[in-house]
Amino acid sequence: MGSFNRRDFLKASIAGAGLLATAPRLLRAAGPVAHFNGADIVELGKTGIKVSRLAQGTGFNGYNHSSEHTRQGKAAFDRLLRHSLDEGISFIDMADLYGSHPFVKDVIKDLPRNKLSLLSKIWPENASWVKSSGGAKEEVDRFRKELGTDHLDVCLIH
């Protein structure tokens, strides 16, 4: 990296000051800032699927059928998910890789299914930790059983 002389310092300082001076004007020109609530129900793209604007993830640092959420134990996981649901976050993001299906099942079992949006993910490759059921349809069927639900709203390839 080259040296930074006095002339370069002054140029950079003047450019920075100019940017700071014009920033408020640029922000006003952009229009009002939209305020959103994470619990707002919105359409997921053009799918017709209704989800809360925010989703509760269940797989931070997920691997080998566990995640930071599930490794904290059932009571902590339940508190986290119930808090999100109490706040109106009804979109739940899971994956076989995270081992979260049984944890989620226990929390949602008495909730109206039409008030939830469930997303899970299939791992596309064979690996020692994959519980392969034979194919995508079989995987989704297994996920539905693990969750105690008749359908998933969204299923992704992880």
Predicted regions and their residues:
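Glycine/proline-rich, positively charged
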Residues: 64-65, 72, 130-158
